[in-house]
Amino acid sequence: MSQNPFEALGGGGFDMNALLQQAQQMQEQLQSAQERLTETVVDGTVAGGAVTVKVNGVGELVGVEIRAGGFDGSDPDDLSDLGDMIIAAYRDAKAQADALAGEALGPLAGGAEGLPGMPGQLGF
């Protein structure tokens, strides 16, 4: 009897080293894509540019711009509206960031859910 348990399955063509090398290449490609996404910034804008929120490609909030003169803070409703606009602008920017991430990670994202260090949405 042979020492190779895979010979019974057709000649023992299973190459663990090749599989590990492929996994390492995929990990490097994923890391590179995530680095590019971290450096990419998208804007979410509402109310004709009254509020603009900047989010990087991994969904991190990196800036908020409020157009001068739009809100003086004297009316409590203005402040409430401002909060709502910031949230809406963030959602817009985050949707764009998610779309970018989907494009950038594409085939690399397949099967990555549940891997250590990549929970749920690849850590985003």
From Swiss-Prot:
Pfam families recorded: YbaB_DNA_bd (PF02575)
Compartment annotation: Cytoplasm, Nucleoid
Amino-acid biosynthesis among keywords: no
Domain of life: Bacteria
GO MF, any single term: DNA binding
Gene3D superfamilies the record matches: Nucleoid-associated protein YbaB-like domain
Record-level GO cellular component terms: bacterial nucleoid; cytosol
Protein task: Binds to DNA and alters its conformation. May be involved in regulation of gene expression, nucleoid organization and DNA protection.
Oligomer and partners: Homodimer.
Full protein name: Nucleoid-associated protein Noca_0318
Organism phylogeny: Bacteria, Bacillati, Actinomycetota, Actinomycetes, Propionibacteriales
